[in-house]
Amino acid sequence: MNFLKSFLFWQPKKDWLLWFEQSLLRKKILIILNYVIWVFFFFISYLLIRKDVNIFWQILIATIIAEIFERFLKRKIYWRRPLFEKNDDLPPGLVKKWYKTGSFPSGHTIKTVYFLLFIIQYQVFSIPLFLSIVSPLLFFRILIGFHYPIDMFGGIITGALIWLLSKWIILPIFITQIFKTIFNFIFFID
């Protein structure tokens, strides 16, 4: 039982967050690594919607459910983020409000999982490439003390459940056509 707990709540001995905060360049890298995944998800969303405009609604519903579920769980299943256990401060450039609740489940992991499952479902991006981009970013969040491994496992399960709920959503054709016209206009698609 101790082994399981030490695995699920593992943190590196070195305080990597403190190391990143010791130079201006590393601080900037920390902020970039925290937010770059959202730019990548925007790109994946674009590829998915371009393949089938109805996917927009699936992604939208998945994201709304994810935000509600994540916020609810982070208030109910509360353990402090590892960085606060080490008495580290949240780096400038991150939204403090988002980090003051519990760390379970990982919101980044929730979104990663449902985007991965949408990619598998609609085949718009290389799965190995997707995993090679997001896996280091997720592990980085454990390394710097934003999450424990158990938070990631909770995110995997939650993300899969959210995908199961949202993958069946199909809106009426006239709504989808209106959105397709807007999407094509914004992204200059003929």
Give the positions of each predicted feature.
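Alpha-helical transmembrane segments of multipass membrane proteins
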Residues: F41, I65-E70, K74, L137, ...
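N-terminal transmembrane-helix/juxtamembrane module of multi-pass inner/ER membrane proteins
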Residues: M1-F41, E70-K100, K180-D190
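Juxtamembrane/transmembrane-helix boundary motifs in multi-pass membrane proteins
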Residues: Q22-R26, Y46, R50-N54, Q58, ...
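Membrane-embedded catalytic cores of phosphoryl/pyrophosphoryl-handling enzymes
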Residues: N87-D190
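Interfacial segments of alpha-helical transmembrane regions
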Residues: I44-F69, M152
